[in-house]
Swiss-Prot record:
Chain segments annotated as transmembrane: none
Protein name in UniProt: Insulin-like growth factor 1.L
UniProt-annotated stretches for the region A: 9-29
Organism: Xenopus laevis
A GO CC annotation given for this chain: extracellular space
Originating gene: igf1.L
InterPro entries named in the record: IGF-I, Insulin-like, Insulin-like_growth_factor, Insulin-like_sf, Insulin_CS
Tissue spec: Expressed in adult liver.
Length: 44
């Protein structure tokens, strides 16, 4: 009696059953360019 059966989230995809890294990555924000917050702070 799961009403959200059609809407599977990251837990359904990768915790209750295994998934590959590429599928796991789809849930994450894209990688940012190499500049870190530390280097930006040092310039001020």
């Amino acid at each position: 009696n799961n009403r959200r059966a059609h809407h599977r989230g990251i837990v359904d995809e990768c915790c209750f059953q295994s998934c590959d890294f590429r599928r796991l990555e789809m849930y994450c924000a894209p990688a940012k360019p190499a500049k870190s917050a530390r280097s930006v702070r040092a310039q001020r």
